Regions:
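Short, hydrophobic/aromatic-rich segments at coil-to-beta transitions
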Residues: 16-19, 139-140
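Short beta-strand and adjoining strand-loop segment in the mid-core
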Residues: 19, 79-86, 116-123
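Flexible, glycine-rich terminal cap/loop adjacent to redox cofactors
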Residues: 102, 113, 118-129, 134-232
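Glycine-centered tight beta-turn/hairpin loop motif at sheet-sheet or coil-to-beta transitions
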Residues: 23-25
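Conserved beta-strand termini and adjacent loop/short-helix elements that scaffold enzyme active sites
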Residues: 5-7, 58, 143-145
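A conserved short coil-to-beta-strand element within the FAD-binding core of flavoproteins
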Residues: 4-16
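FAD-site-proximal beta/loop scaffold in flavoenzymes
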Residues: 2, 27-100, 107, 205
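Short, surface-exposed charged micro-motifs
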Residues: 10, 52, 66, 164-166
Length: 232
């Protein structure tokens, strides 16, 4: 049963689960409680006002392309600035900020930042989505390859899922890669590298991949995007 428009006022751990108290006095008994309400920037205790800084309407600290705030010698990174709240995104921003402090340059390619949902099967993505490409009027082509056609996936008993490669319809440059399946978060690390170095679907499709491995699914999807599929 899915209930909407309900406000939880308290969750109390008990010996055999938890008691969930709702607004209005209703109480639910649960075996497990999953907290999935999203996150928000947390800047309490940073004394931003003392530094002459403030947050935007979403609680984030505004920064420029070099992660500098409006106070030039103060930088901000991670969950308190724009972009996805991902640890590896924050790490890249930290490196870029320090590079800018030391050398006067520093850059993060946000299109090459992968995101992974660690469910079973995993879900992962990097780069543009089809919806974003359509909204921007960018012509693209799609290549897909299923886990069910992978020898390694079949040997693992993990045949559910696929990987999809989006490439520019004219230049063949990879624009986005999305997938669902076993270890797809690991497989898409190569896709992030491809986006970072502006590789084409042909580049990724021609690169040798070990057999049998899950990485072959990405190779085959790239070949399909290049419009030269082999094993499907």
């Amino acid at each position: 049963t899915i209930r909407t428009g309900v406000r939880v006022t308290a969750v109390v751990p008990e010996a055999k689960g938890a008691r969930v108290e709702l607004e209005g006095g209703e109480v639910l008994e649960a075996d497990r409680v999953l907290v999935a309400v999203g996150r928000r920037p947390y800047t309490e205790g940073l004394s931003l006002e003392n530094a002459g800084l403030s947050t935007d309407e979403r609680g984030r600290i505004p920064v420029d392309e070099h992660l500098r705030t409006r106070v030039p010698h103060i930088y901000a990174i991670g969950d308190v600035v724009r972009g996805p709240m991902l640890a590896h995104k924050a790490s890249e921003e930290g490196i870029a900020a320090v590079e800018h402090m030391a050398r006067g340059f520093g850059h993060v390619d946000y299109q090459a930042i992968p995101s992974v949902v660690y469910t079973h099967p995993e879900i992962a993505a990097v780069g543009y989505t089809e919806e974003e490409l359509k909204a921007q009027g960018i012509p693209y082509k799609v290549g897909k390859f299923p886990y069910s056609a992978s020898g390694r996936a079949r040997a693992m008993g993990e045949t559910e899922g696929f990987i999809k490669v989006l490439a520019h319809a004219k230049t063949d440059r990879i624009l986005g890669v999305h997938g669902i399946g076993a270890r797809v978060g690991d497989v898409l690390a190569e896709a992030a590298l491809a986006l970072f170095f502006k590789a084409s679907a042909e580049d990724l499709g021609r690169a040798p991949h070990a057999h049998p491995s899950l990485s072959e699914i990405l190779k085959e999807a790239a070949l399909a995007a290049w419009e030269r599929p082999i094993h499907l």
